[in-house]
Structure formats: structure tokens, C-alpha cells
């Protein structure tokens, strides 16, 4: 019979590692399962300037490495094994990994995160973290007094473009249609901002550069014409921020747990899902702000609630 853990955490990003740290520190037997590499989105961040207490030289990978160390110090196990099947009903939850191994636990914490929807153009992957970003709050400061391009036409794209005007010299909003999906009030506010330039009926065809972004090729969605825009000679680079949506990593939980219409997991303030003993933490859940600091808070709350659940249910 396989070992029954107190807590199994699915996902080793900031939320999952925070949950693992708090769970293991509370003397619960804890296993963290990750399908790819530890860290989630933050491992693509070269500098972490908005996480309280992080040292100046902190990077996404270094912050995650320290979180992993802390989990290990308190006895949490971390294993790479993508989950392919799961049963969350009943007192003991069962997960099956891609390896064929079966895992059992009294509590499951879902911390699978959400990933930015990609633009799908050549150069996007190559220059992610080198001029291409998906987070204005995380990376806007790096483009102080530079030109940036904000891609998208929804509320988030226009709001983030306005946020970028706090740093950038000029913000070009690139949208594939001639009208925004964003609320009219948000668009009107952006139109009054002198730093914002609108580039309608355009998509990103290609991003070019040598080590860093140096030019962007836009395609006119009406005429098909291509236009290459180079960074100003004095700047050498510019930013490309993609705000074309996020994809919650919840495919595994469809028809198993309650999801909202966009695929995120609704929880209460204590991270409870609709299934007793199953919690969700971090970017995967319905929330207003998706940042490392909010993900780690979610993970801590989920772990503490898990401890209370186990004490009440099994002791």
C-alpha cells in the first residue's frame, strides 16, 4: 500500500512552495509534485524588485531556489511527475503520476498556476525576459524612459498600458481590430494620456534582435502590409508587453472540481474549493491580483487550513 501523505501539493511555483514550507514546518508529511521545472512563471524573470525583502541581486530562479531549500530543510519532498489521473472524493485523495506511481493524501492543494497566452510569433520565446514580458507590474520599471509596445485590446491590456506610462517614454497599444474590447471608460482614459499611441488593425508578425529586442515587425490586418519598427538609436532596445490573456492550468480538473467560465478555480478566503480537503492557491484561483507575493500568501493560508482540516477530521 502506498504511503498516505498528510498533504500533496500539485505545482512547485511560489504558491506550491509556500504551501509546502508551511505544511512541512507544521510537521505534516508533505509531497510537492511538479510536471516541469520548479518555479512556474517567475523563473523567466531576471530581476525580482517587487517581492518584499528580496535582495537587489535577486532573480526569479534564485528566489525559487531558496524556497526549494526551505521546503527541503523542513522535510517536504519535491518530485517531478506529471499527474494524469486523480480522484478527489472521499477522505483519502488519490493521484496517479505519468510514471505510473499512485500517490495518496488526506489533503490536496492545487497550485498549478496560470500561464500567459502567447502571441505566437517568431522571436517571442527567444526574447522572453530580454525585452518581451507578460507583466507590467513585474518588469515595467526596466523600461524607464524607453519606448514600449503593449499588445492586446481588452481591459487588462489598456490598463497595463496606462500603468507602463509611469515608466516608459512612449507606450504603443497594438490591437488587431479597429475597436477595443476594453470598457469605454478605460479607453477614454487612455486616449487622454499623451504618452499613449494607438496602433489599430495591427498584429505582431515577428520580434527581432541580437540578445535583446531591437525591432518589431507589425502586420496590418486589413492590407496584410508588414512594417518593421526599430528601437531608437539612443535606446538600443524597447519593451514588448503581451496582454492577450492567461490560461489557467486546470485542464486536469475539468469535471472534477468547480471552475469558473474562464477555467479558474473559485475559492473562499481560506482557499477552500467545493470539495472538502481540496484547496487552491496562487494564480490558478479566481483573484484580483496575480503576483508572487499574493501566491505565497495563498500557499501559506492553504497549508494552515489544511492542518486545521486534518486535526478536525482525522485526530
Locate each region found by the language model.
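Beta1-alpha1 glycine-rich phosphate/pyrophosphate-binding loop at the start
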Residues: 5-74, 152, 158-183
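Short amphipathic alpha-helical segments
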Residues: 20-21, 44, 120-123, 161-163, ...
Amino acid at each position: 500500500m502506498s504511503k498516505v501523505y498528510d498533504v500533496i501539493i500539485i505545482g512547485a511555483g511560489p504558491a506550491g512552495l509556500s504551501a509546502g514550507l508551511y505544511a512541512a514546518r507544521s510537521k505534516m508529511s508533505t509531497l510537492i509534485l511538479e510536471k516541469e521545472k520548479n518555479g512556474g512563471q517567475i523563473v523567466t524573470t531576471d530581476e525580482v524588485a517587487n517581492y518584499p525583502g528580496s535582495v537587489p541581486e535577486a532573480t526569479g530562479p534564485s528566489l525559487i531556489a531558496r524556497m526549494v531549500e526551505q521546503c527541503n530543510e523542513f522535510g517536504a519532498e519535491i518530485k517531478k511527475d506529471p499527474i494524469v489521473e486523480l480522484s478527489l472524493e472521499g477522505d483519502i485523495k488519490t493521484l496517479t503520476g505519468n510514471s505510473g506511481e499512485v500517490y495518496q493524501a488526506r489533503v490536496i492543494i492545487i497550485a498549478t498556476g496560470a500561464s500567459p497566452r502567447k502571441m505566437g510569433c517568431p522571436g517571442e520565446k527567444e526574447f522572453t525576459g530580454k525585452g518581451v514580458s507578460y507583466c507590467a507590474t513585474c518588469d515595467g520599471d526596466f523600461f524607464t524612459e524607453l519606448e514600449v509596445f503593449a499588445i492586446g485590446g481588452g481591459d487588462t491590456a489598456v490598463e497595463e498600458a496606462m500603468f507602463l506610462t509611469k515608466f516608459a517614454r512612449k507606450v504603443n497599444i497594438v490591437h488587431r481590430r479597429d475597436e477595443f474590447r476594453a470598457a469605454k471608460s478605460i479607453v477614454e482614459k487612455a486616449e487622454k494620456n499623451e504618452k499613449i499611441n494607438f496602433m489599430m488593425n495591427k498584429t505582431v508578425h515577428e520580434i527581432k534582435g541580437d540578445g535583446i529586442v531591437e525591432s518589431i515587425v507589425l502586420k496590418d490586418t486589413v492590407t496584410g502590409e508588414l512594417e518593421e519598427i526599430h528601437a531608437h538609436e539612443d535606446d538600443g532596445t524597447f519593451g514588448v508587453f503581451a496582454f492577450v490573456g492567461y490560461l489557467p492550468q486546470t485542464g486536469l480538473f475539468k469535471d472534477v472540481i468547480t471552475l469558473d467560465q474562464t477555467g479558474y478555480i473559485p475559492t473562499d478566503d481560506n482557499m477552500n474549493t467545493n470539495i472538502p480537503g481540496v484547496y487552491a492557491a496562487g494564480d490558478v484561483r479566481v483573484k484580483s491580483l496575480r503576483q508572487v507575493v499574493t501566491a505565497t500568501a495563498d500557499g501559506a493560508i492553504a497549508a494552515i487550513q489544511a492542518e486545521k482540516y486534518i486535526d478536525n477530521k482525522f485526530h
